[in-house]
């Protein structure tokens, strides 16, 4: 199928049906690279491109023709952001209407694309008149961010629209970072170490995992720098029992095993069987010791469904969240999240914290983390939890480049070119 037609279908499913772009792309294997570029770019700039399309259309398209609307946005994205010959963009985008079985739209698409080419500067200036168009985010989210981060809101929105870096975590149980950097250099892959993390490497340009030396042999794992702090903040010691709640796909589970291979037990829990299998696949590829690893399919908040009664020395709760700290990696979040979602995430996190606190040993640590930048999912959750529990105290969390808050540390998107992430370390008093 024409890549522009496929893109229009996928973008339309995100906009109309609130489908995850990651899930849609995983089911579509043909022309993956270009389709991914077109989908990500169109969704990244959706709220800007949408204003242009609405201005140029004499009347709104019918709901059943929203795929054509998305196709037009895809054309605008290519014309403004990609280095593809103009005639190729116009011909391919117009031709996609035929494949979508809507040949009547070919003339309309051709007209709008050519108007965009002729009036581009004027149209882009027009989008700057509204804050949604200027920053390419939904209004409700901009308002939330301005309220939460009055000194940082603009830099957050700008970072959300940037292309994210590709960051690796070197598997130090197999190879040193210095030697792996040499291997990358031999493959002409430009990279630099991130000095604030022992195993992190950032590539100058993203590449396919198949180009990474030793990837299949487990020499590295793809993980943003913001998430690589978790295993160190846990203060792991030999012979401890550790729980990784909400563990899939295993980024932090595997890192825990790399940082300390001599744990007594590591229990990784997730409620999705397919995602749980990915934990096992990732740890197998990395060649990590698994004799003390237990992967359990369960709702971690329902303690009686999975617990043997054993208490844990360390618990990592990387809680399900709005993922508003990783919009640059998942631009569909701008369309998938709604204002009412945030209070639901808040309550779910409190439920998880309360449940997991009961299986933490006295003298143990629970690390709470999210990839959100919204206080309702972060500081306000910890504040409410502390107000209802006596034998708990905050432990210092030192994260390079993070903002120290009353109840934890917040990394904002773009700081040191990291994703947005929140950490709060809780100590259970004896």
UniProtKB/Swiss-Prot annotation:
Keywords: Cytoplasm, Methyltransferase, Ribosome biogenesis, RNA-binding, rRNA processing, S-adenosyl-L-methionine, Transferase. S-adenosyl-L-methionine binds at residues 246-252, 270, 299, 318. It catalyses: cytidine(967) in 16S rRNA + S-adenosyl-L-methionine = 5-methylcytidine(967) in 16S rRNA + S-adenosyl-L-homocysteine + H(+). It is an enzyme of class 2 (transferase). InterPro entries: MeTrfase_RsmB-F_NOP2_cat, MeTrfase_RsmB-F_NOP2_dom, NusB-like_sf, NusB_RsmB_TIM44, RCMT, rRNA_ssu_MeTfrase_B, RsmB-like_ferredoxin, RsmB-like_N. GO terms for molecular function: RNA binding; rRNA (cytosine-C5-)-methyltransferase activity. Disulfide bonds: none annotated. It is found in: Cytoplasm. The active site is at residue 371. GO terms for cellular component: cytosol. Specifically methylates the cytosine at position 967 (m5C967) of 16S rRNA. Belongs to the class I-like SAM-binding methyltransferase superfamily. RsmB/NOP family. This is Probable ribosomal RNA small subunit methyltransferase B.
């Amino acid at each position: 199928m024409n890549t522009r037609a496929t893109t229009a279908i996928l973008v339309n499913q995100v906009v109309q049906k609130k489908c995850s772009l990651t899930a849609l792309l995983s089911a579509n294997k043909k022309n993956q690279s270009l389709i991914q570029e077109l989908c990500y770019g169109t969704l990244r700039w959706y709220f800007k491109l949408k204003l242009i399309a609405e201005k140029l259309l004499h009347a709104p398209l019918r709901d059943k023709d929203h795929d054509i609307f998305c196709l037009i946005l895809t054309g605008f994205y290519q014309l403004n952001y990609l280095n593809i010959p103009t005639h190729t963009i116009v011909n391919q985008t117009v031709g996609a209407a035929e494949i979508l079985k809507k040949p009547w739209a070919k003339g309309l698409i051709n007209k709008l694309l050519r108007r965009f080419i002729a009036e581009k500067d004027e149209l882009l200036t027009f989008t700057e008149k509204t804050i949604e168009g200027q920053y390419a985010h939904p209004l409700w989210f901009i308002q939330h961010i301005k309220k939460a981060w009055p000194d940082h809101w603009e830099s957050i929105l700008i970072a959300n629209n940037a292309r994210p870096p590709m960051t690796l975590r070197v598997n130090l149980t197999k190879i040193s970072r210095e030697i792996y950097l040499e291997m990358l250099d031999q493959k002409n892959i430009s990279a630099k170490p991130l000095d604030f993390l022992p195993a992190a490497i950032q590539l100058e340009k993203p590449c396919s995992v198949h180009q990474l030396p030793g990837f299949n042999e487990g020499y590295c794992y793809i993980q943003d720098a913001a998430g690589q702090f978790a295993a160190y903040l846990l203060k792991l010691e030999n012979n401890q029992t550790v729980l990784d709640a909400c563990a899939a796909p295993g980024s932090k589970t595997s890192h825990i095993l790399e940082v300390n291979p001599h744990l007594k037990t590591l229990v990784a829990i997730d409620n999705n069987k397919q995602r749980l299998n990915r934990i096992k696949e990732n740890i197998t590829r990395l060649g990590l010791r698994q004799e003390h690893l237990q992967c359990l399919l369960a709702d971690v908040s329902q303690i009686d469904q999975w617990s043997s009664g054993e208490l844990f020395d360390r618990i990592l709760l990387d809680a399900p969240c709005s993922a508003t700290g990783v919009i640059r990696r998942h631009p569909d979040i701008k369309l998938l999240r709604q204002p009412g979602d945030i209070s639901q995430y808040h309550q779910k996190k409190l439920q998880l914290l309360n449940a997991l606190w009961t299986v933490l040993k006295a003298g143990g640590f629970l690390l709470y983390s999210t990839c959100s930048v919204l206080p309702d999912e972060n500081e306000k959750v910890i504040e409410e939890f502390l107000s209802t529990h006596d034998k708990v105290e905050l432990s210092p969390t030192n994260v390079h480049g993070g903002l120290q808050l009353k109840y934890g540390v917040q990394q904002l998107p773009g700081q040191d070119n990291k994703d947005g992430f929140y950490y709060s370390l809780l100590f259970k008093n004896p």
